[in-house]
Amino acid sequence: MSRPFRVLLVDDNPADLMLAQEVFAEHGERLTVSTCASGEEALGRLRRGPMPDVVILDVNMPVMSGFEVLQAIKDDPALLSIPVVMLSTSSQPGDIARAYTLHASSYMVKSNSFQKFVDQVDAFVTFWRESRTPSWPDRPGS
């Protein structure tokens, strides 16, 4: 049995954390979700391990913004390969461009409907599972 897909969810809003955890709970044992309420807490957890398969990071947080956390992740050689999805209420092109300039893997806009969020989480889980299970037979002599 393969291990569950590990998600680190970082958001300073307890209501958003709770709602997202409910969305993730629909995946049952396929996902494990850890949460952090600040960027500082998230960086500490990432450096201690275990590494998540994806970090979902709120953009607008006090003290350390999501952009600052993303920059710190990408500046750390031990963390830079972790995919980071930015989650924000802003759909401003400048915010989206900044996220991708800092090497975010994806940028999702928060909305009243979390269906798109669920769909994107499903896509990450599917990609992760398929990328770790070869779909081709081993070649003789390799």
Positions of predicted regions on the chain:
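Conserved acidic segment of CheY-like receiver
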Residues: 4-15, 20-24, 55
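Active-site residues of response regulator receiver
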Residues: 57-58, 88
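His-Asp phosphorelay/catalytic-motif detector in bacterial-type signaling
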Residues: 3-4, 30, 50-54, 78-83
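Acidic, metal-coordinating helix/loop segments flanking the phosphotransfer/catalytic sites
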Residues: 35-54
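Receiver (REC) domain active-site loop signature in two-component systems and cognate sites
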Residues: 61
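CheY-like receiver
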Residues: 119, 126-142
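Short, glycine/charged-rich "phosphate-handling" switch motifs in NTP-dependent
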Residues: 105
